[in-house]
Amino acid sequence: MKKTTLALSALALSLGLALSPLSATAAETSSATTAQQMPSLAPMLEKVMPSVVSINVEGSTTVNTPRMPRNFQQFFGDDSPFCQEGSPFQSSPFCQGGQGGNGGGQQQKFMALGSGVIIDADKGYVVTNNHVVDNATVIKVQLSDGRKFDAKMVGKDPRSDIALIQIQNPKNLTAIKMADSDALRVGDYTVAIGNPFGLGETVTSGIVSALGRSGLNAENYENFIQTDAAINRGNSGGALVNLNGELIGINTAILAPDGGNIGIGFAIPSNMVKNLTSQMVEYGQVKRGELGIMGTELNSELAKAMKVDAQRGAFVSQVLPNSSAAKAGIKAGDVITSLNGKPISSFAALRAQVGTMPVGSKLTLGLLRDGKQVNVNLELQQSSQNQVDSSSIFNGIEGAEMSNKGKDQGVVVNNVKTGTPAAQIGLKKGDVIIGANQQAVKNIAELRKVLDSKPSVLALNIQRGDSTIYLLMQ
């Protein structure tokens, strides 16, 4: 096969050399015209790349020094000859800790590289990831044209991994235009721009692989855009743009067992970035409002168990007293299907979107309750930051001692053994089970009837004090 290919190539070369000068010129012109008509990202990138910057950071962080055996601590005190100038042990953690290396904290300097995006040219605002500039004492920004500026911190939010810095004495900057990230669809083209490994501005392309990704860190507000555009170390804080050159996300994380790119990258949606940075500009921080609910994802099995005619949404398992949700009349067992007229795909998506909204924001939530669509209006209250035991999904309810409460008043939990499945799902002494899988439970016999059907998901309706909650298990 190789010989045939080479022969054909040689033949084509011979014929080409035999062409007249006029024919050769025509061929060259045709080739040039074809090249000019080929689609390219270059015109868009020429406009966008000046708004993407490289960020160099210097800072210090506290690290724990190793704890040495007690018998050796006397030899490594501040006055010890082992810790004096010229000693090979002087720079060791045992001498640097100041207390004989007994496990105390020590300040350690670091340098880091990342990327950022200019969102306000006049004021010099640059958005990046919190993990790029966290603990920074010196922040320097380099533009695509090589100019360098000092920058200062404006605000940061570890829970969303967004930070806002400001270029000092900005001149002739180019700001990026933000797109509506809610309009994104799986399959839309994406372009990632950043500074991987400190190489300088680099461009990669791909598509939107998925929307509404979460679960990287359960405590954070996550509603990621997933893309297969290559995102590597140093790309953090860089831009994810559409083919119009508009910002659709801030690159923030990759899923990579060995630290390299395998085509699974995550970006924070531009609408989320817009809400957070506007608060940082105004307050220097994010002042979150909260709904005051606990919940979980609505999947097909839970929908079947709860007899809900929906496949996607946020299932409300508990409403906190005196919260925004409680005042609006939201109840345990409701399914939140929309926020301000836009569909809600999961509890994580609801949490992330509400988590970017400031105190006092007015919302309209679409609910599915008893098979009917209900809309409620509410105003977000300030986050209480109270830690509430959430209801998780575990197997079984073994470990709970129960008895009938009066005549047909439900099943009361008399005791819960520590470490048992009943304790794990959140059952507590004094709880009263009044329903299971949307069926009323008046006594143990009725509860046993539901359990004997061996449902794939069990949703217990619990009366706890003055509140009604749901505990979910499968």
Curated annotation (Swiss-Prot):
SMART domains tied to this protein: PDZ
Active site: 131 (charge relay system), 161 (charge relay system), 236 (charge relay system)
PROSITE patterns: PDZ
Activity regulation, per record: Inhibited by diisopropylfluorophosphate (DFP).
This protein's UniProt keywords: Cell inner membrane, Cell membrane, Disulfide bond, Hydrolase, Membrane, Protease, Repeat, Serine protease, Signal, Stress response
Swiss-Prot/TrEMBL induction comment: By heat shock. Transcriptionally up-regulated by sigma-E factor and the Cpx two-component signal transduction pathway.
Gene Ontology biological-process annotations: chaperone-mediated protein folding; protein folding; protein quality control for misfolded or incompletely synthesized proteins; proteolysis; response to heat; response to oxidative stress; response to temperature stimulus
Catalysed conversion reaction: Acts on substrates that are at least partially unfolded. The cleavage site P1 residue is normally between a pair of hydrophobic residues, such as Val-|-Val
Residue span(s) of domain PDZ: 280-371, 377-466
Outcome after substituting residue 236 to A: Loss of peptidase activity with no detectable changes in secondary structure
GO annotations of cellular component type: outer membrane-bounded periplasmic space; periplasmic space; plasma membrane
Gene Ontology molecular function, alphabetical: identical protein binding; peptidase activity; serine-type endopeptidase activity; serine-type peptidase activity
Subcellular location: Cell inner membrane
Membrane topology qualifier: Peripheral membrane protein
Disulfide bonds: 83-95
Main location: membrane
Keyword Protein transport among UniProt keywords: no
First and last residue of the signal peptide: 1-26
Protein family (similarity comment): Belongs to the peptidase S1C family.
Quaternary structure and partners: DegP can reversibly switch between different oligomeric forms that represent inactive (6-mer) and active (12- and 24-mer) protease states. Substrate binding triggers the conversion of the resting DegP trimer and hexamer into catalytically active 12- and 24-mers. The conversion of 6-mer (DegP6) into 12-mer (DegP12) or 24-mer (DegP24) is crucial in regulating protease activity.
Further facts: DegP is indispensable for bacterial survival at temperatures above 42 degrees Celsius, however is also able to digest its natural substrates in a reducing environment at temperatures as low as 20 degrees Celsius.
Role, per record: DegP acts as a chaperone at low temperatures but switches to a peptidase (heat shock protein) at higher temperatures. Degrades transiently denatured and unfolded or misfolded proteins which accumulate in the periplasm following heat shock or other stress conditions. DegP is efficient with Val-Xaa and Ile-Xaa peptide bonds, suggesting a preference for beta-branched side chain amino acids. Only unfolded proteins devoid of disulfide bonds appear capable of being cleaved, thereby preventing non-specific proteolysis of folded proteins.
Protein name as it appears in the record: Periplasmic serine endoprotease DegP
Organism: Escherichia coli (strain K12)
Classification lineage: Bacteria, Pseudomonadati, Pseudomonadota, Gammaproteobacteria, Enterobacterales
